[in-house]
Design a protein with these regions (language model features):
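Residues on the lipid-exposed face of transmembrane beta-strands in outer-membrane beta-barrel proteins
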Residues: 92, 181-185, 217-221, 264-268, ...
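Non-catalytic regulatory/gating segments with a bias toward low-complexity or hydrophobic composition
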Residues: 41, 49, 61-62, 131-133, ...
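Flexible loop and strand-edge segments within Gram-negative outer membrane beta-barrel domains
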Residues: 201-208, 212, 226-313
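Surface-exposed extracellular loop regions of Gram-negative outer-membrane beta-barrel proteins
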Residues: 184-200, 228, 234-236, 275-302, ...
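Short strand-turn segments of transmembrane beta-barrel domains in outer membranes
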Residues: 138, 150, 154-185, 196, ...
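Short acidic/polar hinge/loop motifs at secondary-structure boundaries
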Residues: 108-135
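Extracytoplasmic beta-strand/coil segments of soluble accessory domains associated
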Residues: 59-108
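Short, acidic, small-residue-rich periplasmic hinge/interaction motif at the N-terminus
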Residues: 7-50, 58, 269
């Protein structure tokens, strides 16, 4: 018990100790000293994520970031639809489903294309180098979905020359298994990272099992000290169950969810200017049985259909940041997003077996440009102004 308490104490100290020259990329499109930004940013680094040994980044963020709260319902997993957990709120903004709080991966928005809310089980620790949480509005750079704040997952990189492989395994109560294997390579300008995981639990209640498996891969190449290209892909699948209330349990409330994302970016970094152009594509397939209860007062019978949906989100982003004179930084950029999907009830039994009941089929487009101006007045005062149209 003493060892566990000491580990938690050390973990908290590491996460909350910021070095004087720590740089972040959230709240700004270029690496910037955190002291020069007009908003509060918390950083949870890779060491803290590894010490916590959580398959999802959300439990770690809840422990480490002031004002951030997430709902949970069991040993592992959050699920989707009715009875799901994973709702996030930051300084009172958010909730379930999460709105006003934007989740990013390397600056790209991550949410379900149909419902517009994040999928908590998709944000796995295996891909994260660090997580930057901006507490406050950031709509100039990221749009109206970031009114309450931003959670930006910065993906892992291979920093050290050579080949390294890590394997983590854990087993505990309720037949709970956590596993992760990662291989990292860096040779000259070439870098690669491949990681896979398998996690499962029976849960502490009947019909509360959870199973998740997936993988993450990232390749990069530095053409010169000033230009580089990188691409990555992440796919995860999870099976979750909703047990219902203890006094009125649910039967067959099962979910089978697949989420994926991929991106490609070309970056430039010079002494006085830096920028990037990137493309990303996110997708998801949901197969959900709403289940039923055995209480006759509920008048809730087994459903002859399953909710079946496919959603996606595609985007192209460009920005360039320049230092015009001492203490100045001017950033301009354009974002284009296309998102949507289709949903239906698919009958799997009964008289309508094989039929499909249309629910929605839609696609939306969004384009915006922005300019951000920042000027250091002194070592303790910075002027920041921006506009997004």
């Amino acid at each position: 018990m003493t060892g566990l308490a000491q580990t938690a104490k050390d973990s908290t100290r590491v996460a909350r100790s910021l070095t004087i020259d720590e740089v972040v990329v959230t709240g700004t499109r270029n690496e910037t000293d955190v002291r020069h930004l007009p908003m509060t940013i918390s950083v949870v680094n890779r060491k803290v994520l590894e010490q916590s040994f959580q398959p999802s980044v959300l439990p770690v963020l809840t422990e480490q970031v002031p004002g951030l709260f997430t709902t949970s319902r069991g040993i592992m997993g959050y699920g989707v639809s009715t009875g799901a957990a994973g709702g996030m709120s930051l300084r009172g903004i958010g909730g379930s489903p999460t709105a006003g709080l934007l989740v990013l991966i390397d600056g790209h928005p991550q949410y379900m294309g149909l419902m517009g809310h994040p999928i908590a089980d998709a944000y796995q620790s295996l891909m994260a180098e660090r997580v930057e949480v901006l507490r406050g509005p950031a709509s100039v750079l990221y749009g109206s979905n970031a009114m309450g704040g931003v959670i930006n997952i910065v993906t892992r990189q291979s920093h050290e020359e050579g080949v390294k492989t890590n394997l983590n395994l854990g087993y505990g109560s309720f037949n709970t298994l956590q596993s992760e294997v990662t291989n990292r390579i860096r040779k000259g300008g070439f870098t690669s990272l491949i990681s896979g995981s398998y996690n499962r639990t029976d849960g502490h209640r009947r019909n509360m099992g959870f199973e998740q498996y997936g993988g993450y891969a990232k390749l990069g190449y530095e053409f010169s000290p000033y230009w580089n290209i990188r691409g990555d892909v992440n796919v995860t699948h999870f099976n979750a169950s909703q047990p219902g209330e203890v006094t009125d349990p649910m039967i067959d409330a099962d979910q089978s969810i697949t989420r994926g994302m991929t991106s490609v970016a070309v970056e430039n970094r010079y002494e006085r200017t830096s920028g990037a152009v990137s493309f990303f594509y996110n997708w998801g397939d949901h197969w959900i049985n709403d289940g039923y209860t055995t209480n006759p007062d509920d008048k809730n019978n087994p459903k002859p259909y399953r909710f079946d949906s496919h959603d996606d989100m595609m985007g192209i982003s460009w920005y360039q940041s320049a230092q015009l004179f001492t203490g100045n930084r001017l950033t301009a950029g354009v974002d284009y997003y296309r998102f949507g999907g289709k949903a239906q009830n698919r009958y799997v039994e009964g008289e309508r077996n094989g039929e499909r009941e249309h629910i929605v089929d839609k696609v939306q487009h969004e384009i915006a440009g922005y300019i951000d101006f920042r000027q250091d007045i002194s070592h303790w005062l910075t002027l920041d102004a921006g506009i997004r149209i």
